[in-house]
Regions:
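Polybasic, lysine-rich low-complexity intrinsically disordered segments
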Residues: 12-14, 18, 31, 41
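Short, basic, low-complexity termini and linkers enriched in Ser/Thr/Gly/Pro
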Residues: 19, 27, 36-37
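Basic polycationic patches enriched in arginine
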Residues: 5, 25-27
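Structural alpha/beta surface segment adjacent to cysteine/selenocysteine redox centers
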Residues: 62-173
Length: 266
């Protein structure tokens, strides 16, 4: 599901105070843990971010990820994964929007959503031109690019994986590019000055498929069905759909404030 619905699952209330009577009943010899001092180096908060390249809500949410990285820098680490909401785009939209105007109805829906957010541009004929057959083709190609980073074929500090994800989204939503087509994918890679032969090698070897399969396993294990979805705190907290930046920020600040081994209060 490419969802704009805002949903919180399994998270603690921000700023919740522990009652004094409960504190008084704690055993005298029980240790109370405090946040580490500034001199101590904390491991970054790992955020698993699931999205579909063709999802308008993930397109909208990119600015929030950028702001998180600017605000928290090395205090967070975002792991990008893909959920195939539009794995069979044609049939999905034709079936789900049959009684709501078909592809034209979905196009109107996406444009109405986009008008509410000034930081994005959506082509007026979105989902009406050369419609991508499957987002999975995009995700496979993007994993091939990610492998270039992992193997050091491209400089990891250049963040080409993140840049490529955005380039695919921008090409689709602003230019109606059929990003599921391999020729279009290579054209985008060339614009990013990426080594085409090396990307093809990751696909030909099966390694990119293996990375995509790992995403499928994670989607199943973590029951991810919405794009975008953020999962952190070792799977205990998740934010689904169109979640505002301040909500995401508050959750991260809580995790940074509390030591990793702090026990939950009942």
């Amino acid at each position: 599901m490419c969802s704009g619905r805002y949903n919180l699952a399994g998270q603690k209330k921000i700023g919740q105070q522990k009652s004094s009577d409960l504190l008084s009943r704690r055993r005298d010899d029980e240790k109370i843990s405090f946040p580490p001092s500034h001199s101590q180096k904390m491991e970054p908060i790992r955020i698993s971010y699931f999205s579909d390249v063709l999802c308008v809500w993930a397109y909208i949410a990119q600015i929030r990820l950028d702001e998180l990285k600017t605000t928290f820098q090395d205090k967070i680490a975002i792991d990008y994964h893909f959920v195939p909401v539009f794995g069979n785009a044609h049939e999905k939209l034709e079936k789900n929007w049959r009684d709501k105007g078909g592809l034209k109805g979905y196009s109107d829906h996406v444009q109405n959503v986009a008008r509410k957010f000034e930081h994005i541009i959506v082509h007026p004929d979105i989902w009406m031109g050369a419609i991508p057959s499957s987002s999975m083709s995009c995700h496979l190609f993007l994993h091939a690019i990610h492998l270039l980073e992992i193997k050091g074929i491209v400089e990891p500090s250049e963040k080409v994986f993140e840049k490529a994800i955005w380039a695919f989204r921008e090409a689709f939503f602003t230019k109606l590019a059929n990003v599921s087509d391999r020729t279009v994918q290579f054209a985008i890679a060339e614009e990013l000055n990426l080594p085409i032969a090396a990307i093809q090698a990751q696909i030909d070897s099966g390694e990119a498929y293996a990375q995509l399969s790992k995403d499928f396993d994670l989607v199943k294990d973590l029951t991810v069905s919405v794009s975008p979805t953020l999962i952190f705190n070792e799977g205990r907290q998740r934010l689904n759909g169109n979640v505002g930046y301040r909500v995401i920020e508050a959750n991260i600040r809580e995790l940074l404030h509390n030591p990793p081994d702090e026990q939950s209060w009942c």
